[in-house]
C-alpha cells in the first residue's frame, strides 16, 4: 500500500484534488481516503457525498487541535486510521491522507506518508512559492491550484513558476484548476510514475 499525504492551507483545494483523484483512479486501483479536520468530519462528509467511493473507504479523523501535530509530531490517530483501513481492505493499493488546512510548514511524518503533495492556490498571491517553508521546499509534488483566478487576484503565473523552480530545485510542480480538471492528468501521471512505479 502506498500512502500519499495531501496538505496545504485552508481552501487551497486539497479536498477537491482528492475527490478528483478518487473519481479518476478508483476504477483502476484499490483506494481509500483518510481526512483530518480539527473539530468536525466535514471533509470526510463531503467525500462521502461527492466521491465515487463507498463510505467505508473514507475515514474522518477529528484532530481536536493543531492540524500539523496530527500528521507529524503525534500521528497516532492517523496511524490508527491507516491500520483500520488496511484491516478493512487488505489489498489496498493507494491511500490518500488529507491533512487539516495548515500553513506552509506542514509536512507528514514519514511513518504516515510515503509521498507528500502540497497544494497552494494562486488566490494567496504569486509570492507564496518564494515564501518557502517545508511544504513548498520539501514536498514530493507541489500543486499550484486555481490558476483560473490569477487575472482576478493579480497573480503572475510566470513569477510563481520562476519562484517554484528556485525554491524547489529539481522537484516537480504542476499548475492546476482542479475544478475544471485542468492539470489533473499531470497529477495522476506523477502519482502513477513516482508513487505506483508505473511507466
UniProtKB/Swiss-Prot annotation:
| Keyword Nucleus annotated | no
CDD domains associated with the record: UreG (cd05540)
Q: Is Zinc one of the keywords?
A: no
Which key words tag this protein in UniProt? Chaperone, Cytoplasm, GTP-binding, Nickel insertion, Nucleotide-binding
Q: Where's it mainly located?
A: cytoplasm
- Localisation: Cytoplasm
A GO molecular function held by the record: GTP binding
Residue ranges spanning the membrane: these are: none
Q: Which GO terms describe its cellular component?
A: cytoplasm
Please give a single GO biological process term from the UniProt record: urea catabolic process
Give the residues the record marks as binding GTP: 8-15
Look up the domain of life of the source. Bacteria
Q: Which family does it belong to?
A: Belongs to the SIMIBI class G3E GTPase family. UreG subfamily.
What do we know about how this protein assembles, alone or with others? Homodimer. UreH, UreF and UreG form a complex that acts as a GTP-hydrolysis-dependent molecular chaperone, activating the urease apoprotein by helping to assemble the nickel containing metallocenter of UreC. The UreE protein probably delivers the nickel.
Please describe what this protein does: Facilitates the functional incorporation of the urease nickel metallocenter. This process requires GTP hydrolysis, probably effectuated by UreG.
Q: What is this protein called?
A: Urease accessory protein UreG
Origin species: Helicobacter pylori (strain P12)
Amino acid at each position: 500500500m502506498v500512502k500519499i499525504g495531501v496538505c496545504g492551507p485552508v481552501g487551497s483545494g486539497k479536498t477537491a484534488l482528492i475527490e478528483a483523484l478518487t473519481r479518476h483512479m478508483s476504477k483502476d486501483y484499490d483506494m481509500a481516503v483518510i481526512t483530518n479536520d480539527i473539530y468536525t468530519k466535514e471533509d470526510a462528509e463531503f467525500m462521502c457525498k461527492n466521491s465515487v467511493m463507498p463510505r467505508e473507504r473514507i475515514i474522518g479523523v477529528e484532530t481536536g487541535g493543531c492540524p500539523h501535530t496530527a500528521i507529524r509530531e503525534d500521528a497516532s490517530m492517523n496511524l490508527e486510521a491507516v491500520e483500520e483501513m488496511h484491516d478493512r481492505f487488505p489489498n489496498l493499493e493507494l491511500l490518500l491522507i488529507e491533512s487539516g488546512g495548515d500553513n506552509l510548514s506542514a509536512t507528514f511524518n514519514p511513518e504516515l506518508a510515503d509521498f507528500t503533495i502540497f497544494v497552494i492556490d494562486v488566490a494567496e498571491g504569486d509570492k507564496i512559492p518564494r515564501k518557502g517553508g517545508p511544504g513548498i521546499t520539501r514536498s514530493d509534488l507541489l500543486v499550484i491550484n486555481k490558476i483560473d483566478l490569477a487575472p482576478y487576484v493579480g497573480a503572475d503565473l510566470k513569477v510563481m513558476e520562476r519562484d517554484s523552480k528556485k525554491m524547489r530545485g529539481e522537484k516537480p510542480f504542476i499548475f492546476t484548476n482542479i475544478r475544471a480538471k485542468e492539470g489533473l492528468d499531470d497529477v495522476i501521471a506523477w502519482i502513477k510514475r513516482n508513487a505506483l512505479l508505473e511507466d
